[in-house]
Amino acid sequence: MSESTTGPCHDSLKAYVREIPDYPKPGILFYDITTLIKEPVGLARTIDGITEHFLNKNIDLVVGMEARGFIFGPAVAYRLNAGFIPIRKPRKLPGETVKHTYKLEYGEDTLEIHKDAIQKAQRVLVVDDLLATGGTAVAATELVKQLGGEICGIAFVIELDFLNGRERLKDYDVYSLLHYDK
């Protein structure tokens, strides 16, 4: 089911993304979205691009992962007339939570969501800024499913195609605005 949609309209957004070599460590090329979101046109076209893909999916809730999913998720939720649910690092949410621990290259990480955030069968869109290896997105989908939500799609601003994160999400409608192959 995983699909890839990018067109000239979206590719032009790359002009707003700053490339920083050797960050956060030597050999890494970092794609900085702060230059994208500081420009009203860049931010608007990003939100519009994600929203347009999911307009007819009857989304009830948008879930965004800490931290940059919080930038795009609420705006997408507003445009889709949906609610917004944050997924956070451990001990950042005040109420009762459920958690999912997942493996990283060197260690593990955990994400949490409020236990009452999603009702059974609610239609959920997961939004984040970047798809790299897919670990964070998989953890988010597991949390949504654990609460009984139905995942209607996963949206990213940027996808690093060379890391093959999409493979881990092949059961979902994955939509990325911008693709980078290096």
From Swiss-Prot:
<dbReference type="GO" id="GO:0005737">
    <property type="term" value="C:cytoplasm"/>
</dbReference>
<protein>
    <recommendedName>
        <fullName>Adenine phosphoribosyltransferase</fullName>
        <ecNumber>2.4.2.7</ecNumber>
    </recommendedName>
</protein>
<dbReference type="GO" id="GO:0016208">
    <property type="term" value="F:AMP binding"/>
</dbReference>
<keyword id="KW-0328">Glycosyltransferase</keyword>
<dbReference type="GO" id="GO:0044209">
    <property type="term" value="P:AMP salvage"/>
</dbReference>
<keyword id="KW-0963">Cytoplasm</keyword>
<dbReference type="InterPro" id="IPR005764">
    <property type="entry name" value="Ade_phspho_trans"/>
</dbReference>
<comment type="function">
    <text>Catalyzes a salvage reaction resulting in the formation of AMP, that is energically less costly than de novo synthesis.</text>
</comment>
<dbReference type="InterPro" id="IPR050054">
    <property type="entry name" value="UPRTase/APRTase"/>
</dbReference>
<keyword id="KW-0660">Purine salvage</keyword>
<dbReference type="GO" id="GO:0006168">
    <property type="term" value="P:adenine salvage"/>
</dbReference>
<dbReference type="InterPro" id="IPR000836">
    <property type="entry name" value="PRibTrfase_dom"/>
</dbReference>
<keyword id="KW-0808">Transferase</keyword>
<dbReference type="GO" id="GO:0002055">
    <property type="term" value="F:adenine binding"/>
</dbReference>
<dbReference type="GO" id="GO:0006166">
    <property type="term" value="P:purine ribonucleoside salvage"/>
</dbReference>
<comment type="similarity">
    <text>Belongs to the purine/pyrimidine phosphoribosyltransferase family.</text>
</comment>
<dbReference type="Pfam" id="PF00156">
    <property type="entry name" value="Pribosyltran"/>
</dbReference>
<comment type="pathway">
    <text>Purine metabolism; AMP biosynthesis via salvage pathway; AMP from adenine: step 1/1.</text>
</comment>
<comment type="subunit">
    <text>Homodimer.</text>
</comment>
<dbReference type="GO" id="GO:0003999">
    <property type="term" value="F:adenine phosphoribosyltransferase activity"/>
</dbReference>
<dbReference type="InterPro" id="IPR029057">
    <property type="entry name" value="PRTase-like"/>
</dbReference>
